[in-house]
């Protein structure tokens, strides 16, 4: 069987799946193997899966080759040239901030359009202002007394893993910080946010190339699969992974053998001290937790207070629009949001209070 498979592969022409004299790969496989109807179905499925895995593993390789060529050109650019590219990305992202936010919410069903837009603008404007004058290229600092010189050099090709909760803003800021330092970046999109991520990549890519960035500086896997992402993360030419997403994905990045910087859920408790301004503390906690329907990785998950503060904090929460559950409502909500294995029900992610209450059967929540 192994010899026949090799023979079939030799018949491949012009990148076609290994068929035989124009016939589909499945037909050739079945002609050689034969079998019952169940065997035929199994053969078709196995060949299809094998072809998909081969193709998925090849997609990142093409992007990596292009990125490697871009890396050589970026390495020869001056700080002024890199700054021009970064500025162009910021301007384009700001111009399309609302449209990209709308796309993200419509595709994923997560969050609020106005908050997604604010995140896009934060990445495009606030982040840009913070890094605009930072020197990343060449001699960064010199200490004559200690006889040391700090020299900035590109790290190389970066793999950018993008989540579905913050898809467009993540692409914007990762593109900016990579171009600022002269590093090509290849994005691996979350499967449930492919379209808005690809469109954001196109926006920043066109802006970057229009400002002088070489082709291949910013790219994206168009059909995300586990095989494609792993191939990208583990390739020798990938020098750094910027992983934003769930715990399993961040863990996979850390165990890939490539240096990685991971960002995942960090939704911890907020402690209100007895000396705090209760009104202001509650306002900030509610603003944080409700922003983009709680999709921010650092939005507060719970509130901790001293017993003597409980009444004041509870009253302030109600005054600012929070709804406090009674024991039965607490039971219903807990049963809905926590699955038997201890994980969270994904149906609540990025959804409004009204939607979560309805799904959990809470009829009194306004």
Please state what every model-predicted region is:
Residues 47-149, 177, 319:
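N-terminal Rossmann-like NAD(P)+-binding subdomain of aldehyde/semialdehyde dehydrogenases
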Residues 68-71, 75-78, 89-97, 101-104, ...:
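Structural signal for hydrophobic packing residues in well-ordered secondary-structure cores
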């Amino acid at each position: 069987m192994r010899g026949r498979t090799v023979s079939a592969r030799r018949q491949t022409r012009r990148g076609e799946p290994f068929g035989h004299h124009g016939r589909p790969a499945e037909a050739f496989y079945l002609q050689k193997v034969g079998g019952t109807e169940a065997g035929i179905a199994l053969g078709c499925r196995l060949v299809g899966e094998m072809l998909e895995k081969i193709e998925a593993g090849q997609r990142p390789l093409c992007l990596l080759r292009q990125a490697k060529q871009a890396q050589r050109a970026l390495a020869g650019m001056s700080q002024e040239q890199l700054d021009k590219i970064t500025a162009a990305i910021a301007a384009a992202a700001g111009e399309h901030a609302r449209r990209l936010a709308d796309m993200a919410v419509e595709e994923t069903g997560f969050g609020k359009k106005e908050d997604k837009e604010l995140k896009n603008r934060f990445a495009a404007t606030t982040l840009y202002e913070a890094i605009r004058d930072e020197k990343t290229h060449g001699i960064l600092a010199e200490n004559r007394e200690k006889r040391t010189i700090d020299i900035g050099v590109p790290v190389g090709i970066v793999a950018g893993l993008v989540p579905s909760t913050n898809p467009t803003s993540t692409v914007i800021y990762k593109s900016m910080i990579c171009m600022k330092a002269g590093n090509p970046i290849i994005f691996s999109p979350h499967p449930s946010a492919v379209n808005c991520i690809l469109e954001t990549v196109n926006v920043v890519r066109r802006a970057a190339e229009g400002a002088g960035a070489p082709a291949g500086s910013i790219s994206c896997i168009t059909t995300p699969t586990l095989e494609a992402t792993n191939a990208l993360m583990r390739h020798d030419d990938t020098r750094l992974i910027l992983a934003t997403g769930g715990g399993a994905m961040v863990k996979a990045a850390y165990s890939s053998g490539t240096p990685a910087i991971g960002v995942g859920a960090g939704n911890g408790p907020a402690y209100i001290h007895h000396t705090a301004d209760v009104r202001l503390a509650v306002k900030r906690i509610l603003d944080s937790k409700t922003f983009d329907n709680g999709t921010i990785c650092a939005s507060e998950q719970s509130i901790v207070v001293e017993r003597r503060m409980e009444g004041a904090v509870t009253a302030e929460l109600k005054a600012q629009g929070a709804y406090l559950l009674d024991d039965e409502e607490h039971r219903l909500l807990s049963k809905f949001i926590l699955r038997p294995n201890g994980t969270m029900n994904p149906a609540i992610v990025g959804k409004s209070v009204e939607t979560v209450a309805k799904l959990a059967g809470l009829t009194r929540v306004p």
